């Protein structure tokens, strides 16, 4: 039973009438452009074929009822006429409540909804299960009540909910790609203007995501430190963000900067340039150049931004040794564990899977999880 059938069946069973709509919003993986989003830079993610699915129907009152199928059918219920506050014990509820609360501030021309939610985006793997949920919930209200909101506004609404209601700092990339993703394409996103350009993916290439299953511990504190270091760098150049600093300007005065800050700045500037070039390489189907750019990106994250861990570097080395120059691999996500992403010709996927299975656990003592994905469509009815 797929997620649509599962949520529709559960909806009828619990609420006693059929759902009128089923909405999906995908998770994502970022192909290149790491820690560039909060520096007003460029990112190149694609939506993946793992998603949050919500079967739903409008109500004729002001009540919102929600069932979380993946949490033993836990329920939440709240009124649109009372202040929406955080739920004490159900963290998943706060993503739903936060999205609805922030939607009210944007456009409150909507009434109650019944919904059943289920998803298969792996949680804690850095594949944006939370953004997928936020965008799915926003799309439910937009579709059921014909709200005049576009994908970018639904994405911004989800980001606000996560930052201000759930209390977790995040850039805009995750929500934007979930809302605007295009099948068989990646999206080059300008995080300053939120402009997005669809970039066609080469045919016969798989998007492979491998979770190192190394438990991330430093990610929160170190993420904030990196942001501060980048802001320090921007201030040094008297610019609003590192997006506005050229590599030439940086190289001319790099020795005057604090050495650690200089390394952080060099990563962001070089990564921005790589991301823009990667979009063009991908569009031309030049997997060899894309692979070189991904390798440079990984080295920069390891040596200049210092956010990789030995387990991730091991995983990258195993994949690279197997594919040579026929594709690319790098760490993806915030760092300190998480996943690597690889672009691999489909016929090489079994060899990569076998090499990783034989070597990774033997070298690290941890078993990986292997996902073969396709670039998929953004949020909408399914």
Curated annotation (Swiss-Prot):
Record keyword Kinase present: yes
Q: Which UniProt keywords apply?
A: ATP-binding, Carbohydrate metabolism, Cytoplasm, Galactose metabolism, Kinase, Magnesium, Metal-binding, Nucleotide-binding, Transferase
Pathway where it operates? Carbohydrate metabolism; galactose metabolism
| Active site (UniProt) | 174
Entry's Gene Ontology cellular component terms: cytosol
What are the subcellular locations of this protein? Cytoplasm
UniProt: Mg(2+) binding residues? 130, 162
Recorded GO MF terms: ATP binding; galactokinase activity; magnesium ion binding
Keyword Magnesium on entry: yes
Query: Which InterPro entries does this chain map to?
Result: Galactokinase (IPR000705), Galactokinase_bac (IPR022963), Galactokinase_CS (IPR019741), GalKase_N (IPR019539), GHMP_kinase_C_dom (IPR013750), GHMP_kinase_C_sf (IPR036554), GHMP_kinase_N_dom (IPR006204), GHMP_knse_ATP-bd_CS (IPR006203)
Q: What is this enzyme's catalytic activity, as reactions? A: alpha-D-galactose + ATP = alpha-D-galactose 1-phosphate + ADP + H(+)
So what does this one do?
Answer: Catalyzes the transfer of the gamma-phosphate of ATP to D-galactose to form alpha-D-galactose-1-phosphate (Gal-1-P).
Q: What is this protein called?
A: Galactokinase
| Species this protein is from | Salmonella paratyphi A (strain AKU_12601)
Name of the gene: galK
């Amino acid at each position: 039973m797929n997620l649509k059938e599962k949520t529709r069946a559960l909806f009828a069973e619990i609420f006693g009438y059929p759902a009128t709509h089923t909405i999906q919003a995908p998770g994502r993986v970022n192909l290149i452009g790491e820690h560039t989003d909060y520096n007003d830079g460029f990112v190149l993610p694609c939506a993946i074929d793992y998603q949050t699915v919500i079967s739903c129907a409008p109500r004729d009152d002001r009540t919102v009822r929600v069932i979380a199928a993946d949490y033993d059918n836990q329920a939440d219920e709240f009124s649109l006429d009372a202040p929406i506050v955080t739920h004490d014990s159900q963290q998943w509820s706060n993503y739903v409540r936060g999205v609805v609360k922030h939607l009210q501030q944007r456009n409150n021309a909507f009434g109650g909804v019944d919904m059943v939610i289920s998803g298969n985006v792996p949680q804690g793997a850095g594949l944006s299960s939370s953004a997928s949920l936020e965008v799915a919930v926003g799309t439910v209200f937009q579709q059921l009540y014909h709200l005049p909101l576009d994908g970018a506004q639904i994405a911004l609404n989800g980001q606000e909910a996560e930052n201000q209601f759930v209390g977790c700092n995040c850039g805009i990339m995750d929500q934007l790609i979930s809302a605007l993703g295009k099948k068989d394409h990646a999206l080059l996103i300008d995080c300053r203007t939120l402009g997005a350009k669809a970039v066609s993916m080469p045919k016969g290439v798989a998007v492979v995501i491998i979770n190192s299953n190394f438990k991330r511990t430093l990610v929160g504190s170190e993420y904030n430190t990196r942001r501060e270091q980048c802001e320090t760098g921007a201030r040094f150049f008297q610019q609003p963000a590192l997006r506005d600093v050229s590599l030439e300007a940086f190289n001319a005065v790099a020795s005057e900067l604090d050495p650690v800050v200089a390394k952080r700045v060099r990563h962001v500037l070089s990564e921005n340039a790589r991301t823009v070039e990667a979009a063009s390489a991908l569009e031309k189907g030049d997997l060899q150049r894309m692979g070189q750019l991904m390798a440079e990106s990984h080295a920069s994250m390891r040596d200049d931004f210092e956010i990789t861990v030995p387990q991730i570097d091991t995983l990258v080395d195993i994949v690279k040794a197997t594919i040579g120059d026929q594709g690319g691999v790098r760490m993806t996500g915030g760092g300190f564990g998480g996943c690597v992403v690889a672009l691999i010709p489909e016929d090489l996927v079994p060899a990569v899977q076998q090499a990783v299975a034989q070597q990774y656990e033997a070298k690290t003592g941890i078993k990986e999880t292997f996902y073969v994905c396709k670039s998929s469509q953004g949020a909408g009815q399914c």
